[in-house]
Amino acid sequence: MKQIIFNNNKNIVSDKIKKYRIKRKISQGDLAARMQVLGVNVNQQAISRIEKNLRQVTDYELACFCKCLDVKPDELLSDFDKYFE
């Protein structure tokens, strides 16, 4: 799959995923396990790479992050405008 990088970012939700994960007191490993229950094949290392902005996030992964973290998609995407500055 071709890697798309937007303004030097592989994803635009890394900070928000980490913020909500920590706020909910969920470890990266626990988040990965919750994602796997939903059928998304990610492990703790993948969560770490996503949070460090080293890995892209697919649309179905984004939907599952929202479910696992109990947030709406617009909450994860709310700072999108800052990537245009």
Q: Which ranges hold each PLM region?
A:
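A short, Lys/Arg-rich alpha-helix, primarily the initiator
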Residues: 1-24
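Short, charged recognition helix plus adjacent turn
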Residues: 2-7, 30, 67, 74-85
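Flexible coil/turn residues that form the inter-helical turn or adjacent wing/linker of helix-turn-helix
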Residues: 13, 24, 40, 55-58
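Residues that mark the N-terminal boundary/hinge immediately upstream of a DNA-recognition element
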Residues: 16, 27, 58-61, 72
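Residues in the recognition helix of alpha-helical DNA-binding motifs
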Residues: 20, 34, 50, 79
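Short alpha-helical DNA-recognition segment
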Residues: 25-49
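Short, basic-rich loop-to-helix N-cap that marks the start of a DNA-contacting helix
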Residues: 52-64
